[in-house]
């Protein structure tokens, strides 16, 4: 359960980071 939740958080974090880089690039 924790691993699945962590993977989900990492995916969301990656997407948010990519969006932020795109917005500020």
Curated annotation (Swiss-Prot):
The keyword Secreted applies. Its main location: secreted. Membrane-perturbating peptide with multiple activities. It is insecticidal, since it induces reversible paralysis in insects (L.cuprina) after 1 hour, but fails to kill them. It shows moderate antibacterial activity against some Gram-positive and Gram-negative bacteria. It is also antiparasitic, since it moderately inhibits the larval development of the major pathogenic nematode of ruminants (H.contortus, IC(50)=23.2 uM), but fails to reduce the motility of adult males of the other nematode B.malayi. Keywords: Antibiotic, Antimicrobial, Membrane, Secreted, Target cell membrane, Target membrane, Toxin. Belongs to the ponericin-L family. This is M-poneritoxin-Nc2a. It comes from the Eukaryota. It comes from Neoponera commutata (Large hunting ant). It is found in: Secreted; Target cell membrane. GO terms for biological process: defense response to bacterium. GO terms for cellular component: extracellular region; membrane; other organism cell membrane. Expressed by the venom gland. One of its GO terms (molecular function) is toxin activity. Transmembrane segments: none annotated.
């Amino acid at each position: 359960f924790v691993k699945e939740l962590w993977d989900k958080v990492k995916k969301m974090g990656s997407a948010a980071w990519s969006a932020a880089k795109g917005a500020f690039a």
